[in-house]
C-alpha cells in the first residue's frame, strides 16, 4: 500500500490556501490555482500544513487521498516556484519561434505548424532548436509539451524529431543487406 497520503503538504511562506467544501484554492506569488478534490478524501488545513485522510467506508479512499495529496503538492509548488519543460528540435531545417501566444514550428512538413498556447502557459525560444514552456500548472505545461512533441516524435533510426531535453532516444541499427 502506498503511504503518499500520510505525509502532509507544508505550506511555504507567501502561499495562501483556502478550503471551501471539497474545493481547494492555492494563491501564491505566481498566480492562483483551484481544484475540486474527490469526495472520498477529507482535507484539513492546520499548523501551516495540508493534511489528508480517507473517508471511512469508501473502497479506494487511500488511493484517492494519495492522488489528491500529489495534485495539491503540485499546486503549491506551482504557485510558489512554477514549472518548466524544455523541448529540443533535432533535424535538418527543424526550427521554432514564438509569436505572441503561438509557437511557429517548421518540422520538415510541406507547411509550417502553428501551435496555439493555452492561457497560463508561456513559451520562449533561446535558440531556433529549443523551446522552453513555463506555467504554474504542472498538468497543463506537460500536456502542451506532449502536444508539441506529438507533431514529430523522435524516430529511432536517425533520432530526428521533437524530444524532451532529458529524453534519451533508443536508436536502432539500419537493416543490413
UniProtKB/Swiss-Prot annotation:
InterPro entries the record matches: Ribosomal_uL6-like, Ribosomal_uL6-like_a/b-dom_sf, Ribosomal_uL6_a/b-dom, Ribosomal_uL6_bac-type, Ribosomal_uL6_CS
UniProt-listed Pfam families: Ribosomal_L6
PANTHER family per record: 60S/50S RIBOSOMAL PROTEIN L6/L9, LARGE RIBOSOMAL SUBUNIT PROTEIN UL6M
Family: Belongs to the universal ribosomal protein uL6 family.
Species in which this protein is naturally found: Shewanella amazonensis (strain ATCC BAA-1098 / SB2B)
Function recorded in the entry: This protein binds to the 23S rRNA, and is important in its secondary structure. It is located near the subunit interface in the base of the L7/L12 stalk, and near the tRNA binding site of the peptidyltransferase center.
Biological process terms in GO annotation: cytoplasmic translation
Name this polypeptide is given: Large ribosomal subunit protein uL6
Quaternary structure annotation from Swiss-Prot or TrEMBL: Part of the 50S ribosomal subunit.
Keyword annotations from UniProtKB, A to Z: Ribonucleoprotein, Ribosomal protein, RNA-binding, rRNA-binding
Gene Ontology molecular function, alphabetical: rRNA binding; structural constituent of ribosome
Gene Ontology annotations for the cellular component aspect, listed alphabetically: cytosolic large ribosomal subunit
Amino acid at each position: 500500500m502506498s503511504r503518499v497520503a500520510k505525509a502532509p503538504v507544508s505550506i511555504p511562506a507567501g502561499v495562501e490556501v483556502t478550503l471551501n467544501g471539497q474545493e481547494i484554492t492555492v494563491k501564491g506569488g505566481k498566480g492562483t490555482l483551484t481544484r475540486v478534490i474527490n469526495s472520498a478524501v477529507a482535507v484539513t488545513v492546520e499548523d501551516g500544513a495540508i493534511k489528508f485522510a480517507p473517508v471511512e467506508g469508501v473502497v479506494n479512499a487511500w488511493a484517492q487521498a494519495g492522488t489528491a495529496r500529489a495534485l495539491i503538492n503540485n499546486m503549491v509548488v506551482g504557485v510558489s516556484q512554477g514549472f518548466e519543460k524544455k523541448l529540443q528540435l533535432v533535424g535538418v531545417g527543424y526550427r521554432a519561434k514564438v509569436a505572441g501566444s503561438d509557437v511557429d514550428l517548421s518540422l520538415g512538413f510541406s507547411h509550417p505548424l502553428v501551435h496555439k498556447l493555452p492561457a497560463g502557459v508561456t513559451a520562449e525560444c533561446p535558440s531556433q532548436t529549443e523551446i522552453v514552456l513555463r506555467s504554474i500548472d504542472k498538468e497543463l505545461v506537460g500536456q502542451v509539451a506532449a502536444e508539441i512533441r506529438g507533431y514529430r516524435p523522435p524516430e529511432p533510426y536517425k533520432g530526428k524529431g521533437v524530444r524532451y531535453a532529458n529524453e534519451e532516444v533508443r536508436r536502432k541499427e539500419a537493416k543490413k543487406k
